[in-house]
Curated annotation (Swiss-Prot):
GO biological process, one term: ribosomal small subunit assembly
Name of the protein in question: Small ribosomal subunit protein uS19
Molecular functions (GO terms): rRNA binding; structural constituent of ribosome
GO CC terms in record: cytosolic small ribosomal subunit
Species annotation: Methanopyrus kandleri (strain AV19 / DSM 6324 / JCM 9639 / NBRC 100938)
Homology family: Belongs to the universal ribosomal protein uS19 family.
Classification via HAMAP family: Ribosomal_uS19
Length: 149
């Protein structure tokens, strides 16, 4: 958790793209330069407690992939879509601008991370249930396999 982000990690265009966005009074550029321990104090209580207890190995693995993609982005290359099952990972400022495919139980849903998503869970953006659009046969799980003549 004591990893520092260097100022070289942040491209020059980064602050210009999301100038008007602020999280708890800090711009995205300031959040990117901030040490992770300082950023944790800005989060709501549930997320703060979760991060203070330490990250499980699967979350650390996801962060390694995010940092690898961020390095590719700095070099001017398009980073690959990062696939993960970690629905309970909290979105951190270093994830902004990347595309993460989150598993919803059936398939991977691509989520483009925006600054407004900071502090939320990845699973909030990959719905596990389909919304019902009609009330006929097949609308509910119990009527999915009713023969249609």
């Amino acid at each position: 958790m004591a990893e520092e982000r260097s100022k070289d990690d942040i491209p020059d265009w980064w602050e210009k793209e999301w100038v008007e966005f602020r999280y708890r009074g800090y711009t995205l550029g300031e959040l990117m330069k901030m040490p992770i321990e300082e950023f944790i104090e800005l989060l709501p209580a549930r997320q703060r407690r979760s991060l203070k207890r330490g990250l499980p190995s699967r979350h650390k693995k996801l962060l390694r992939k995010v940092r690898r993609a961020r390095r590719l982005l700095r070099r001017g290359k398009k980073p690959p879509v990062i696939r993960t099952h970690c629905r309970d990972m909290i979105i951190l400022p270093e994830m902004v601008g990347l595309t993460i495919a989150v598993y919803n139980g059936k398939e991977f849903k691509e989520v483009k991370i925006e600054p407004e998503m900071i502090g939320h869970y990845l699973g909030e953006f990959a719905k596990t249930r389909k919304t019902v659009e009609h009330g006929g046969i097949g609308a509910t799980r119990s009527s999915l396999f009713v023969p249609l003549k």
